């Protein structure tokens, strides 16, 4: 039995957002010790890079794993929730979850999964907070 080839594809986009690393479960002193300058009461921002990787069989009719134009639109729906926002104040998820880049990766994965026409091909998302700080989430 012939099996269709498995291919990964990746789309990259970016967004700018502000946040403050602060946990309500920690005292002010513990927050300062844990998060350092990222606990600044006025917050700070990043120009994030968001990479989305899909993995699946190549459709014999379209020759694609997933329609890139469709993925671009779906990613745009997610980007609209975070781009030029204060994550802690403007995104419901982060009102109760510390806005670490680990949690940003989880949020972006789950949010994208919820709007994709075929979420089964979503393999992983990567958030680059800086060129040296990179976080990847593959889902549960």
UniProtKB/Swiss-Prot annotation:
GO terms for cellular component: mitochondrion. It comes from Caenorhabditis elegans. Its cofactor is Zn(2+). Coiled coil: none annotated. Involved in the biosynthesis of tetrahydrobiopterin, an essential cofactor of aromatic amino acid hydroxylases. Catalyzes the transformation of 7,8-dihydroneopterin triphosphate into 6-pyruvoyl tetrahydropterin. Homohexamer formed of two homotrimers in a head to head fashion. GO terms for molecular function: 6-pyruvoyltetrahydropterin synthase activity; identical protein binding; metal ion binding. One of its GO terms (biological process) is tetrahydrobiopterin biosynthetic process. It comes from the Eukaryota. InterPro entries: 6-PTP_synth/QueD, 6-PTP_synth/QueD_sf, PTPS_Cys_AS. The lineage of its organism: Eukaryota, Metazoa, Ecdysozoa, Nematoda, Chromadorea. Transmembrane segments: none annotated. Belongs to the PTPS family. Pathway: Cofactor biosynthesis; tetrahydrobiopterin biosynthesis; tetrahydrobiopterin from 7,8-dihydroneopterin triphosphate: step 1/3. Its EC number is 4.2.3.12. Zn(2+) binds at residues 19, 44, 46. Binds 1 zinc ion per subunit. The active site is at residues 38, 84, 129. This is Putative 6-pyruvoyl tetrahydrobiopterin synthase. The keyword Cell inner membrane does not apply. It catalyses: 7,8-dihydroneopterin 3'-triphosphate = 6-pyruvoyl-5,6,7,8-tetrahydropterin + triphosphate + H(+). Keywords: Lyase, Metal-binding, Tetrahydrobiopterin biosynthesis, Zinc. The keyword Zinc applies.
């Amino acid at each position: 039995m012939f099996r269709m080839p498995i291919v990964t594809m990746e789309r990259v986009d970016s967004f700018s957002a502000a946040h403050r690393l602060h946990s309500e479960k920690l005292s002010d002193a513990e927050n300062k010790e844990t998060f350092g300058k990222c606990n600044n009461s006025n917050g700070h921002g990043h120009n994030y890079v968001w990479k989305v990787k899909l993995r699946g069989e190549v459709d014999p009719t379209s020759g694609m794993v997933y329609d890139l134009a469709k993925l671009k639109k779906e990613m745009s729906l997610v980007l609209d929730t975070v781009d030029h926002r204060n994550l802690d104040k403007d995104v419901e998820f982060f009102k109760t979850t510390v806005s670490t880049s680990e949690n940003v990766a989880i949020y972006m994965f789950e949010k994208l999964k919820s709007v994709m026409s075929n979420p089964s091909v979503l393999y992983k998302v990567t958030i680059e907070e800086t060129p040296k700080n990179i976080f990847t989430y593959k889902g549960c």
